[in-house]
Amino acid sequence: MLSLLNPKAESIQRAQALQVNISAAIGLQDVLKSNLGPTGTTKMLVDGAGAIKLTKDGKVLLTEMQIQNPTASCIAKAATAQDDATGDGTTSVCLLVGELLKQAELYIREGLHPSLISDGFNLAKNEALTFLDSFKTDFEVDREVLLNVAKTSLSTKISSKVVESLAPAVVDAILTIRRPDEPIDLHMVEIMKMQNRSASDTQLIRGLLLDHGARHPDMPKQVKNAYILILNVSLEYEKSEINSGFFYSTSEQRERLVESERKFVDNKLRKIVELKKEVCERDPTANFVIINQKGIDPLSLDVLAKNGIMALRRAKRRNMERLQLACGGVAQNSVDDLNPEVLGWAGSVYERTLGEEKYTFVEDVKDPKSATILIHGPNTYTIQQIQDATRDGLRAVKNAVEDNCLIVGAGAFEVACAAHLRNKFAAKEVKGKAKMGVYAYADALLIIPKTLAANSSYDTQDAIVALQEEASEGYKVGLDLKTGMPFDPEVEGIYDNYRVIRHMLHSATVIASNLISVDQILRAGRSSLKEGPPQ
């Protein structure tokens, strides 16, 4: 029938279509499987231009790899959507989808209809979500617990030595910008990079770091007790917004024209200098700093330097809001109503030079609502890895604070949920052949602890049996990657995010259910409809 509708369309039907989907899902699973956990391996990505990227991050891999297979591409998009929504769980989604399809295939080969397995998957998912709510651990915001959350997330991406220095910076950044009863805005945490020193020198700045310095050699490079004027005012002569022209016939006329143009800017400078003198008369130890979003011409810089004012021009727009949150003060679009109340304050503002780059640090602020994480590293590969890990760590801590609950990690939830689904839910509450789908779902969940064991060079069967024996006695047990034996993850401070696990169960189940329900794959785009030349 399809050949009558479109002679050039390609079609794969029934068992063959299912096999194509299962093979694609398992293929993607095999690529990502070795990345999972702290002992996972790193992938090297080489693009068409020969640029190299080293990463363990599932989202980076799925985004950078050019996936041609439509089924694998579908899974990859869902997994990256998981990262966009929760900040983690990309690799876990791909592993779980692949394992769900692999387990489903075993029952389909025995003659069970895919729709019955799909029904079982949905029943198991709903029960797993209910079990997740009973399995979670409630907690009040505590720095030590949040440090463990950050370390759990970061250790899957970077080395343990770097984790020890980066985790406190990530947690303190979240606690700095957090406000009661308000959502946490991660845009208020700036991530800056410096290619120098070692990765373990990464630090948190409770303030702001600007990637440029003062533009005049006579300006002070370091000031204490700094009053900061945040401006969005042009301190240079600008062309008018409408087309206009001026004509002069003598040099005197030209001089008067230049003088009137200069007077326009000088009037603005006079008001700024008057404000500076007013502030310094009140507090003789005070210094004055201007951070302007627009330009400052050389003559204006000279005037400011003579008055001992440190001035930065063309600050990035995104930093203007962060600057107000970090230092206080109000950004001014005009110099007409300047007064000391609009000024921000910082205990220290200083400039540092690294190679040809200049950086300005704004530190020791009173009540920062914005912060900067400064990443150090010996090369671009290391810095990029730390940057990706930092973003994931910030999301993990943010999720924990907003959820007010955690899930013990190291595969503990998956082992406990699999036992619950198989021994209690399927055995007592599910009737008919849908029970097979629940069994398949329970077995598929074990892919997470199995992969953790395999990546740590332990026998997967020994590890799973030991975990199941401990879990059957009612304990929350995970896999100790150092010994390969069961242990209590809560004692070691290994936690996963509640919303990450919840989203993973939703996403993986929906994708797997849809893929096993496919009985025909059609390739019939516009290009296949083009007729050849007439004979």
Curated annotation (Swiss-Prot):
Keywords: ATP-binding, Chaperone, Cytoplasm, Nucleotide-binding. GO terms for molecular function: ATP binding; ATP hydrolysis activity; ATP-dependent protein folding chaperone; unfolded protein binding. InterPro entries: Chap_CCT_zeta, Chaperone_TCP-1, Chaperonin_TCP-1_CS, Cpn60/GroEL/TCP-1, GroEL-like_apical_dom_sf, GROEL-like_equatorial_sf, TCP-1-like_intermed_sf, TCP-1_chaperonin. The keyword Heme does not apply. It is found in: Cytoplasm. The keyword ATP-binding applies. GO terms for cellular component: chaperonin-containing T-complex; cytoskeleton; cytosol; nucleus. One of its GO terms (biological process) is protein folding. It comes from the Eukaryota. Molecular chaperone; assists the folding of proteins upon ATP hydrolysis. Known to play a role, in vitro, in the folding of actin and tubulin. Heterooligomeric complex of about 850 to 900 kDa that forms two stacked rings, 12 to 16 nm in diameter. Belongs to the TCP-1 chaperonin family. This is T-complex protein 1 subunit zeta. It comes from Schizosaccharomyces pombe (strain 972 / ATCC 24843) (Fission yeast). The gene is cct6.
